[in-house]
Every structure is written in structure tokens, then in C-alpha cells.
Amino acid sequence: MLLYRLGKIIHVNKKYIIFESDSAGYTINITRAENFEKDRTLKLYIYELSNEYQKTLYGFTHFKERVLFEDLISINGIGPRIALILLNDGWEKIASLIANGNWETLSRYPYINVKNCHQIIFELQNKWAKFLEKDEKVPSANIQNISDATETLKMLGFKREQIKYALESANLQDDVETLVENAIKKISTVNGKEARN
């Protein structure tokens, strides 16, 4: 799974950037072009959408924005175009609308109907209410980060055995985002070795 790349922004357009990473250039669709500056070096969270005809990349500056994009396009009737329109208003705002069940405001966005909004709320409200609740709380101990990372990895589709293996030697001082990234790397490394054997 491609989660992120480290690289440099070569060009910024209203709808996409050209991103250079490991001596290769990528055209990556984005939200909120004002968040991207030419010649800036950054970690870009990437979602890769592939079919038999083409591969399209979508880039995000925040991990949870990537997760929300993936959640939105999993809803019947919500494609990447509509998901980007929603996220262009700020992922935190859209996540809050979903968590609070505010389908009326969601229905005011272009190309999205009331049926779509009800489906989004039905399928995603509980998940994002928990996500946002965790953001608002200050953990009483670093072990809470392990718990949050475990839940995030479950939401991303990893199996319990994979998660246990990936987090058993984790650094408790790491934040949730770092724990998740390192866990995915560890799982991917093991999968790669198994594929070669």
C-alpha cells in the first residue's frame, strides 16, 4: 500500500501539483491549492486509484484527510471528484459535519444529493465521531497512542495478527501518526519477503 512520499513540489496548479520524489515526477490531484507552495519539500500522503485504463494519484497534507477521502469514495455515488469538492472546504469541517450527522449542510455542496448525504452519515458517522473525540482528548498515558494506532490500522483493513506483530516493538513515545506509518512499513516488509520466498 502506498501511504506517503517524501519529495519536492515542482509546480502548483489549482487542481494538481507536480511532485518530484526519488528522481521521478508525479502528477497528483489535490484539494486547497493554497496549502501547497512551489519548491516546498514535504511528506505527502497519497491515495492511488487504479483501474485497467489508468492510475490516478491524490495527495493530502494530513493523514486523516487521506483516510476521509478513502472513506468518502467507498460510498456508492461518491467518486473522487465529489470527494475532492467536499474536502476542498477543509477535511476537519467535513469530518465534523459527518460526525454530527449534519446531512442538511452536506447536501448544499455541488453534485451531491440528499440520498448520498444520508448514506455518508449512515456509514461514516460513528467512525468519525470516534476519530474526532480522540483528537479532543489528551491521553493520560502514551499507551493510549498504541490503542489509537491499533484502531486506525483496523479501520485501514489490516488483520489483528498483522497489527499485533507491527506494534509489539513500537516506540511508546511516538505519536499515533508515526506509529501507523511505521506499522504499515513493517507489515509491507514482511509481505514483500513472503512474496519472494
Curated annotation (Swiss-Prot):
Entry annotated with the keyword Zinc-finger: no
Organism: Mycoplasmopsis pulmonis (strain UAB CTIP) (Mycoplasma pulmonis)
Domain II as annotated region, ranges: 62-136
Location, primary (coarse class): cytoplasm
CDD domains: UBA_RuvA_C (cd14332)
One MF term in the entry's GO annotations: four-way junction DNA binding
Protein family according to the UniProt entry: Belongs to the RuvA family.
Region entry Domain I, spans: 1-61
Record has Transmembrane as a keyword: no
Sorted UniProt keywords: Cytoplasm, DNA damage, DNA recombination, DNA repair, DNA-binding
Subunit structure: Homotetramer. Forms an RuvA(8)-RuvB(12)-Holliday junction (HJ) complex. HJ DNA is sandwiched between 2 RuvA tetramers; dsDNA enters through RuvA and exits via RuvB. An RuvB hexamer assembles on each DNA strand where it exits the tetramer. Each RuvB hexamer is contacted by two RuvA subunits (via domain III) on 2 adjacent RuvB subunits; this complex drives branch migration. In the full resolvosome a probable DNA-RuvA(4)-RuvB(12)-RuvC(2) complex forms which resolves the HJ.
Residues passing through the membrane, by range: none
Record-level GO BP terms: DNA recombination; DNA repair
Residue ranges, annotated region (Flexible linker): 136-140
Subcellular location: Cytoplasm
Full protein name: Holliday junction branch migration complex subunit RuvA
Domain writeup: Has three domains with a flexible linker between the domains II and III and assumes an 'L' shape. Domain III is highly mobile and contacts RuvB.
Domain of life (superkingdom): Bacteria
Main function: The RuvA-RuvB-RuvC complex processes Holliday junction (HJ) DNA during genetic recombination and DNA repair, while the RuvA-RuvB complex plays an important role in the rescue of blocked DNA replication forks via replication fork reversal (RFR). RuvA specifically binds to HJ cruciform DNA, conferring on it an open structure. The RuvB hexamer acts as an ATP-dependent pump, pulling dsDNA into and through the RuvAB complex. HJ branch migration allows RuvC to scan DNA until it finds its consensus sequence, where it cleaves and resolves the cruciform DNA.
InterPro entries: DNA_helicase_Holl-junc_RuvA_I, NA-bd_OB-fold, RuvA, RuvA_2-like, RuvA_C
Gene Ontology, cellular component aspect: cytoplasm; Holliday junction helicase complex; Holliday junction resolvase complex
Residues covered by region (Domain III): 141-197
Name of encoding gene: ruvA
